[in-house]
């Protein structure tokens, strides 16, 4: 709807729209996929950013959310200093409950904190939905229905975004010149402003790992676009080990977590190993794109990430599998 509105509003303008949204992904994923999924498509003039819905359920801590959101803004402006950005916060039942208690949802607070720091507009659609429900204008279960809203919710989102754009366009002077945004001092030196994907072929691994150039599931579990029929580094073997050399101050993995996903142990350089269960509450029916940061706030430089498949597994998992789609590197 927004694309159609912009084309109607500016009929003499040729638009190139990039539909980069992927269900289940939050700010951490966005900060590392921004380059490939958006910026590599060409010079971007206007970018909409939303991660508030999925950040709550992703298990990503508040500091990492801030590093991610700030990294998105800074990375975008390093690509095109004149790019305009609009932050948005979509609705869910968790946010409704927070607002009922008089509390600003943490995900909304962090989106707005980054927006304020960089003088970016922020459209709080979660608060709009909550207030209309409390005013009796509609009901969540019967009308709005889901975080992927029913037509009523889609129309509400569209009208609010359109209203903001109309107000902005109507206050633009005829002689306005495009200027660069100032890349001010970050709130943290560890923001993921250089976040990117690194190829799984760069890992050094034992014979228990297999490079699959076009992975598809062997069962009937659901998948997400961009995370099926793509290259992956996979294993189902206990003890399978790999080493991934990287340069930067943060590292992680993007995996697909299905019903046989296992537990890994990992370490960076000579640190003590830590354990991470890659099985999720959705893994019994979906190969969930699952982004996990394994090291952050590191000294900027060369490091080695080591990953090993553990013998034990989640009680609900059917195996000890790990399927890595991307390594994540900030640097």
Can you annotate each of these PLM segments?
Residues 170-245, 254, 316, 327:
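Glycan-recognition and processing domains
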Residues 4-16, 20, 25, 31-174, ...:
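Alpha-helical cap/lid subdomain in secreted, periplasmic
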């Amino acid at each position: 709807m927004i694309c159609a509105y912009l084309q109607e509003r500016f009929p003499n303008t040729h638009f190139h729209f990039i539909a980069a949204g992927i269900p289940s992904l939050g700010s951490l994923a966005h900060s590392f996929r921004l380059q490939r999924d958006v910026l590599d498509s060409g010079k971007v003039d206007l970018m909409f950013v939303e991660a508030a819905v999925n950040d709550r359920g992703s298990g990503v801590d508040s500091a990492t959310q801030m590093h991610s959101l700030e990294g998105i803004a800074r990375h975008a402006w390093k690509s095109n200093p004149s790019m305009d950005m609009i932050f948005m916060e979509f609705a869910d039942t968790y946010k409704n409950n927070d607002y009922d208690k008089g509390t600003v949802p943490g995900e909304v607070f962090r989106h707005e904190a980054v927006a304020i720091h960089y003088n970016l507009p922020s459209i709080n659609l979660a608060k709009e939905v909550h207030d209309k429900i409390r005013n009796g204008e509609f009901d969540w279960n019967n009308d709005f229905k889901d975080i992927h809203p029913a037509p009523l919710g889609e129309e509400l989102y569209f009208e609010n975004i359109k209203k903001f754009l109309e107000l902005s366009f109507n206050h633009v002077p005829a002689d306005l010149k495009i200027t660069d945004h100032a890349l001010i001092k970050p709130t943290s030196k560890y923001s993921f402003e250089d976040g990117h994907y690194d190829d799984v072929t760069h890992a050094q691994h034992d014979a228990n790992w297999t490079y699959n150039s076009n992975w598809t599931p062997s069962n009937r579990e659901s998948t997400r676009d961009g995370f099926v029929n793509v290259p992956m580094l996979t294993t189902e073997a206990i003890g399978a080990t790999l080493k991934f050399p990287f340069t930067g101050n943060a590292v992680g993995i993007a995996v697909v977590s299905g019903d046989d996903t296992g537990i890994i142990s990992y370490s960076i350089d000579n640190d003590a190993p830590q354990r991470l269960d890659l099985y999720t509450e959705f893994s019994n029916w979906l190969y969930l794109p699952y982004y996990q940061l394994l090291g952050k706030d590191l000294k900027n430089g060369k490091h080695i990430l080591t990953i090993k498949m553990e013998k034990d597994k989640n009680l609900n998992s059917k195996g000890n599998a790990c399927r890595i789609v991307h390594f994540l590197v900030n640097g």
